[in-house]
Amino acid sequence: MMGRGKLILIEGLDRTGKTTQCNILYKKLQPNCKLLKFPERSTRIGGLINEYLTDDSFQLSDQAIHLLFSANRWEIVDKIKKDLLEGKNIVMDRYVYSGVAYSAAKGTNGMDLDWCLQPDVGLLKPDLTLFLSTQDVDNNAEKSGFGDERYETVKFQEKVKQTFMKLLDKEIRKGDESITIVDVTNKGIQEVEALIWQIVEPVLSTHIDHDKFSFF
């Protein structure tokens, strides 16, 4: 029986090289791979999110924007599952973990990790999650484009990193073996690419039954 495709997620702070590595991996896995970037800004919900991220005058409560981010993931999940069942691999640039970490890092009353994860319960879990970690968040601020969108400040990114680590540690302690933290501090694009491929290649060669999925 033909196995399904693999769902591979690359997570991390802003300007840590996620998108670059997603694009590299996507091209490497052609012709049988699709690339998804969250938020998916081409949808109606994604358009609202894009406006919020790029226009400081567009105000929403922390709870409302968090639920919009989650809704943006839910509106695409059936398409993701369909592609996987057809045997296609999918590389994702951000997903549930980003949504939870960025919202919980705001410190809004009542929005702890458990509350922030609740709207995503039932979404597909990746077969592999790679978190690109850096020891020097300050260096990210010097990269082109940093600060163009809401959340791109060094102070907030430090909070997000701490929240990410708490969230991932919690998932790992619950027995999730699909998460790997990759230290990209002072590493070049090709060096990170090689590290990622060492982790991804064995997952690609593993057979996963057509109807076997994990969920948040």
Curated annotation (Swiss-Prot):
Q: In which pathway does it act?
A: Pyrimidine metabolism; dTTP biosynthesis
Q: Where does ATP bind?
A: G12, L13, D14, R15, T16, G17, K18, T19
Q: Which terms are listed as keywords in the entry?
A: ATP-binding, Kinase, Nucleotide biosynthesis, Nucleotide-binding, Transferase
Catalysed reaction(s) here are: dTMP + ATP = dTDP + ADP
User: Which InterPro entries does its entry note?
Assistant: P-loop_NTPase, Thymidylate_kin-like_dom, Thymidylate_kin_CS, Thymidylate_kinase
Which terms in the Gene Ontology molecular function aspect does this entry carry? ATP binding; dTMP kinase activity; nucleoside diphosphate kinase activity; UMP/dUMP kinase activity
Query: Which Gene Ontology cellular-component terms appear in the entry?
Result: cytoplasm; nucleus
Q: Which biological process terms from the Gene Ontology are attached to this UniProt entry?
A: dTDP biosynthetic process; dTTP biosynthetic process; dUDP biosynthetic process
**Matching Pfam families:** Thymidylate_kin
Q: What class of enzyme is it?
A: transferase
List its EC numbers.
2.7.4.9
Q: Which SUPFAM superfamilies does the record match to this protein?
A: P-loop containing nucleoside triphosphate hydrolases (SSF52540)
Q: Any idea what job this protein has?
A: Catalyzes the conversion of dTMP to dTDP.
Q: Please state which protein family the record places this protein in.
A: Belongs to the thymidylate kinase family.
What's in the misc comment field? Present with 2980 molecules/cell in log phase SD medium.
Subunit description: Homodimer.
Protein's recorded name: Thymidylate kinase
Organism expressing this protein natively: Saccharomyces cerevisiae (strain ATCC 204508 / S288c)
